[in-house]
Design a protein with these regions (language model features):
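Catalytic core of Fe(II)/2-oxoglutarate
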Residues: 160, 169-240
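Fe(II)/2-oxoglutarate
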Residues: 1-30
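Conserved short histidine dyad/triad with adjacent acidic residue
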Residues: 140-156, 169
Length: 240
């Protein structure tokens, strides 16, 4: 694992390591690369707060809507990988149709990620779902205090190539424990106390990984805004 300083400059993620070196470390060497402090914590808190408020107004969905904006409260076992999980995801496949204030905040997060993804993978994405083929699925995930987690699972390397996990919460303030773990060449890498709010974790997309359980001392409640929040930049064809 390597930690690299980063910041946002005029809507572009600037890192203390060249793009080709970030890609080489993550893709070719299989390292976990953390871009430290890439986003301002106040922005991410605002994104998280506005997204949660939207989810309190819009009823939770029972099925995935890969062409629309929706959120789901999941307490289940995934069909393909049989990975148990409890989390609340917020999905913006039609980002342009989101309420204006929320859309503006989300774009301040996902536009810089779009540029970073293009630079690292060579894939140009947009926030409009095409008729066919792979496209980006902007997503926020909340692991509620009281038991949120995601069991060990993996993804196909292509077409994504590299995954992003943006930390939207402050450890010790919004949540006490829980974090993403990877297994690489038989070694477990636990990011629980390494990834802070504003950091972007860049990782090779076929690494085995899981999310450890949030604090069981807390009472679980879908309608609470606290817990561990992350943003992801998933790129796939849901109908392939």
């Amino acid at each position: 694992m390597v930690e690299i300083g980063a910041h946002l400059q005029h809507g572009v993620i600037v890192a203390d390591l060249a793009r080709e070196d970030i890609r080489h470390r993550a893709m070719d060497r299989g390292e976990i690369v953390i871009l430290k402090q890439a986003f301002d914590p106040d922005l991410l808190t605002a994104v998280r707060t506005a997204t949660f408020a939207w989810g309190q107004v819009i009823p939770a969905g029972d099925v995935d809507d890969f062409s629309g904006n929706y959120h789901r409260r999941r307490a289940m076992i995934s069909r393909l990988q049989q990975a148990p999980h409890i989390f609340h995801d917020y999905n913006f496949n039609a980002l342009g149709a989101a309420p204006a204030a929320l859309q503006g905040l989300l774009l301040r997060l996902f536009e810089p990620l779009r540029g970073l993804f293009r630079d690292l993978t060579g894939i140009e994405t947009s926030f409009v779902a095409p008729a066919t083929g792979a496209y980006v699925h902007p997503q926020l995930i909340q692991y509620p205090n009281g038991g949120g987690f995601f069991g060990r699972h993996w993804h196909n390397l292509h077409p994504q190539q590299l995954g992003f996990i943006v930390s939207l919460s402050k450890r010790g303030l919004d949540y006490r424990n829980g974090g993403t773990c990877f297994e690489i060449d038989g070694d477990v890498i636990d990011l629980g106390d390494r990834q802070d709010i504003g950091d972007i974790t860049v990782w090779r997309y076929d690494h085995q990984h899981w999310v450890t359980q949030s604090d069981l001392k807390e009472k679980f409640d879908w309608d609470r805004a606290d817990g561990r929040w992350v943003a992801t930049y998933a790129y796939f064809d849901p109908f392939a």
